[in-house]
């Protein structure tokens, strides 16, 4: 199926990026543990309460693993390549979710008493090889920052998680 083929590309690219940038399993696991700890802390403080709609069977992110340790993650099998570095803890989980964002003109938001959460000051896209597609956001982000006359130091928050830790670390 096409979804299976797409999934295989994701899997391969995670290993390819790790290999290209010499990112070890330990480094990916450290990133995953830190990601889970930060997410658990934010969830415990209620920081996600306005972002997650309770649908009865689910009221919070069930993929946060606050008990993750290097020892526990060391026990996981390699996920995709028996000579690789990526495990279930450092790749994208099988999960369901949905998201919606309203993007509108500033005047429309003001006229309709909508809270303005952000301004889009620049956009960009970046083509890249399929076997390292996880690197695409790097070039796109650099180009968008340049167009906006900003640097990464001007950005307050960058959200990255453990899903394919190799690309986040690259």
Task: Identify the residue ranges that each predicted region occupies.
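Active-site pocket-shaping loop/turn-to-helix segments
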Residues: 7-8, 19-33, 86-100, 121-147, ...
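Single conserved hydrophobic/aromatic residue that forms the stacking wall/gate
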Residues: 1-6, 10
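Structural signal for hydrophobic packing residues in well-ordered secondary-structure cores
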Residues: 14, 18-21, 25, 32-47, ...
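Structural alpha/beta core scaffold segments of enzyme domains
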Residues: 109-110, 146-152
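Short glycine/threonine-rich loop-to-helix capping motif typified by GTGT followed
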Residues: 59-64, 130-137, 162-170
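N-terminal extracellular/periplasmic Venus flytrap/periplasmic-binding protein-like
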Residues: 27-111
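Conserved small-residue
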Residues: 14, 28, 73, 96, ...
